[in-house]
């Protein structure tokens, strides 16, 4: 529904469209005013660090850039809830770290509820306020942990948090 946004493991972009056209896709389907939407597209491209790439075909982008397009495409629609299914799993370490910081920044600035699915314990600790460990078959919540590290990540560099004794012992 329109109250939910989704960011998949792979960008799930329309390769035949440009970056701007991909970001604008949801608004176009809602038949929003094109003059107003282009301004929003440009704003979101700047937020995700892709200013100047609007006319670039998405197949020419790196994996990290494609994920940022997917994130902007989700967020431009202003969903109440953002579902992220391993969106950073296929990225190299440096790009992944940048994207983790970006997700925290967007969370802080928008106040959106984000449900992030990841197999990376470190990523879950860094980005989550709460961590749910799932039990196998049937899938159900096995354990819940409340975490302080996402709030810390809004103030400190993520690399510094990883050096924190509490982070290390929790991990």
Feature-to-residue mapping (PLM):
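Short coil-to-helix segment of the ABC ATPase nucleotide-binding domain corresponding to the Q-loop/switch region
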Residues: 17-24
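Hydrophobic anchor residue at the start of the ABC signature
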Residues: 71
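Helical segment within the ABC ATPase nucleotide-binding domain
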Residues: 96-110
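Catalytic Walker B motif of ABC-type/P-loop ATPase nucleotide-binding domains
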Residues: 82-85
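Conserved H-loop
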Residues: 111-117
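Conserved ABC ATPase "signature" region
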Residues: 24, 35-53, 105
